[in-house]
Regions:
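Structural microenvironment flanking redox-active thiols in thiol-disulfide oxidoreductases
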Residues: 363-403, 415-419
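Non-catalytic, surface beta->alpha helical segment in thiol-disulfide oxidoreductase systems
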Residues: 427-430, 436-456
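N-terminal targeting signals for export/organelle localization
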Residues: 253-324
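Short active-site neighborhood of thiol/selenol oxidoreductases, capturing the structured segment around
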Residues: 341-372, 385
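A non-transmembrane, solvent-exposed segment enriched in polar/low-complexity residues
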Residues: 17-173, 186
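N-terminal "domain-start" segment that seeds a small globular fold
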Residues: 309-344, 406-407
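Bacterial Sec-dependent N-terminal signal peptides
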Residues: 1-27, 443
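Short, internal strand/loop/helix patches
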Residues: 400-436
Length: 456
């Protein structure tokens, strides 16, 4: 992937970092190029900390007096990125929303650890593409490749650590970023290829587990660690006679994962985070909806976080409202005149397909429009309504006009958090099929599904 190289901004506020005075505050600021909205949100542990507004030049900044050391997420719809903050940090970031992850550059106190994390994340994506062709190798050859990559990252980490005065916590986090990523790849290989391994093969292959910790309370909300633990739980839950990609679709498989969490994970926060992730995997598998009441009984027994419980139950109930025959839940949207209207107003007594797109993912948008054109030829009686997940502006309206789209069929979401909850918008390839009365035919269709035409 191409990387944008930005000129790093240094603000006057950083001059205060030169003083030999202990500072327990955390400063966070920066600039977003080509923003998709007028704000970004700071999260911790899946809870909103603050909403940071962009000024007329798309800058934001705020000093926090009581933030703890740990992992935070900055969200600029539809993108987000994890950052690691500690008291005394004065972190600036610059990002182009069109190439969000690839363009992030940090500067200021606390930048070295975060630049290491983002570059590690980007290189992991490149390596994963390379490794996708290596899963056919024997396990010893695959392990050798991973060992080589681990050594390379370890040397990069040593170099970074040697020129920065990192805290013990920051050292642990930056090291864990690559250690658990590669451990995760090993677990994934085992899920795909390890069904018929002998005990001696398993013992040799899984020896890396002896160096890992399954009770990392400091990493309980760190994505590389959680991703590893989820694949580890999957490997532990998979019977030798089962095929992973088929088995993981079953509710019983996720119940088994919950039971392993309950019986083997002691730390409450880690246990709740793992259970929440498993619950989302299951509840968002719409084909299993009839079995979710049973699944939730097991989830209730494992989870002790009331907020997570409310989230999962709310998601389950919102999915019910999107079932076949239901009336599409009402949200407020923006029309091409930039007026706010009710979503009920887009209905016009014609069967309708609603599709979604993002102003920061134009390649996806073009692919979607090509699919829509093909469907139009075979199903001319349908109306096709495009909804941007960010509010419209004059530039977007101009682009849609250049693409030959009827502005009467183009709308935008005003409050993504509310809309994504009510309409269960988790992926941009989601589409909603309505009959001529506005009732739901399929609330969870995939616009790129080859079987979509058969539903119309």
């Amino acid at each position: 992937m191409n990387k944008f190289k930005f000129f790093i901004l240094f603000a006057i506020v950083f001059s205060s970092c030169k003083k030999e005075v202990k500072n327990n505050n955390i400063f966070l600021g920066g600039q977003i190029i080509n923003p998709s909205s007028s704000y970004l949100i700071l999260h911790k542990n899946n809870s909103t900390i603050d909403c940071l507004l962009l000024d007329s030049n798309n800058f934001f900044q705020k000093k926090f007096n009581n933030l703890e050391s740990g992992f935070y997420k900055i969200e600029h719809i539809p993108e987000y990125q994890t950052i690691f903050l500690e008291p005394g940090d004065s972190l600036w970031l610059r990002v182009n929303a069109v190439e969000f992850k690839q363009s992030i550059v940090y500067s200021g106190k606390g930048s070295s650890k975060n630049n290491f994390l983002i570059q590690n994340d980007i290189s992991n994506e490149i390596e994963n593409e390379f490794l996708s062709s290596k899963y056919s190798l024997k396990n010893n050859l695959f392990s050798n490749i991973i060992d080589s990559l681990v050594l390379q990252k370890k040397n990069q980490w040593k170099n970074m650590d040697s020129i920065n005065n990192l805290s013990k916590y920051a050292q642990k986090v930056t090291m864990a970023a690559y250690v658990y990523n590669y451990a995760n790849l090993r677990e994934r290989y085992a899920l795909l290829r390890g069904a018929n391994w002998s005990q001696s093969e398993k013992k040799k292959y899984f020896k890396y587990r002896y160096f890992l910790n399954f009770e990392e309370t400091d990493l309980s909300s760190f994505d590389p660690y959680i991703d590893y633990m989820l694949n580890y739980l999957s490997e532990q839950s998979l019977d030798s006679s089962n095929y992973y990609f088929k088995t993981k679709q079953n509710t019983d498989f996720n119940i088994k994962r919950l039971k392993i969490v309950e019986n083997n994970i002691i730390g409450r926060e880690l246990k709740n985070n793992l259970a929440r992730a498993i619950a989302y995997d299951e509840i968002l598998n719409f084909d299993n909806h009839s079995q979710h009441e049973n699944f939730l009984q097991y989830y209730f027994a494992v989870n002790s976080n009331t907020r997570f419980l409310g989230e999962v139950l709310s998601l389950h109930n919102d999915i019910k409202k999107m079932n076949v025959g239901s009336i599409l839940p009402r949200i407020f949207i923006q029309n091409s005149k930039l007026d706010t209207i009710s979503s009920n107003e887009i209905l016009n007594k014609k069967p309708t397909i609603i599709y979604f797109w993002s102003q920061t993912q134009m390649n996806q948008y073009r692919k979607t429009l090509k699919v829509i054109e093909k469907i139009k030829i075979k199903k001319p009686e349908y109306r096709f309504v495009g909804i941007s997940i960010q509010p419209l502006n004059k530039m977007v309206l101009k682009v849609n006009k250049m693409l030959g789209l009827d502005k009467k069929d183009q709308y935008a979401i005003i409050n993504f958090e509310n809309a994504s909850k009510k309409w269960i918008i988790t992926l941009l390839n989601k589409s909603i099929i309505l009959d001529s009365n506005g009732n739901i035919v399929n609330g969870f269709a995939n616009i790129f599904d080859l079987e979509l035409l058969n539903e119309l």
